[in-house]
């Protein structure tokens, strides 16, 4: 099973489209399907760099201003990211991520075993329709009342159990917050 969230989904999609390895299931958090023009990506890079670095400088104090939460369980990861981030690395990542271009094609059989989760309250929900058009055989659960990556951060055990259910039974479990 391939699991991808946020910008890391670019790597997972490259893996799915460029490898000969068999993948039975994939799960994507829909936030990574934002499509932003090249000029806009160039403009936002220095601001994003400053925002991420500020997480290190403020010991996580700016997290709530940048992201939807300031959960103590994720602060150490963002602080470390802010400490280790270089402008060059971010520029390279942004230059080949979030591109405003067609999604790569995937075989129908693989699409049937891919889950593209979108939280209902995140800005990236607006990209759901484009993903549905690109992959018409995929599965598109909506996590009602959730933001980008919020379920996996607040309930990692429940998230892991959900992924195990998908791998074992080829379907989403019945969860009270899932809208189809």
Please describe what each predicted stretch is:
Residues 2, 28, 114-118:
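Structural beta-sheet core signal
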Residues 92-133, 142, 151-152:
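Conserved serine/cysteine hydrolase catalytic core
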């Amino acid at each position: 099973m391939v699991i991808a969230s946020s910008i890391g989904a670019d790597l997972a999609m490259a893996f799915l489209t460029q490898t000969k390895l068999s993948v039975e299931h994939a799960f994507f958090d829909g936030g990574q399907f934002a499509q932003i023009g090249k000029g806009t990506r160039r403009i936002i890079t220095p601001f994003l760099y400053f925002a991420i670095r500020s997480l290190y400088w403020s010991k996580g104090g700016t997290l709530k201003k940048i992201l939807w939460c300031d959960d103590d369980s994720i602060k150490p990861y963002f602080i470390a990211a802010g400490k280790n981030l270089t402008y060059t690395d971010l520029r390279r990542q942004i230059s080949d991520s979030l591109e405003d271009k067609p999604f790569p094609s995937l075989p129908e059989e693989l699409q049937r075993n891919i889950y593209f989760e979108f939280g209902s309250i995140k800005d990236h929900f607006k990209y759901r329709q484009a993903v549905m058009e690109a992959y018409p055989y995929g599965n598109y659960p909506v996590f009602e009342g959730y933001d980008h990556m919020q379920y996996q951060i607040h309930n990692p055990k429940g998230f892991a159990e959900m992924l195990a259910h998908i791998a074992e039974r080829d379907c989403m479990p019945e969860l009270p917050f899932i809208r189809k």
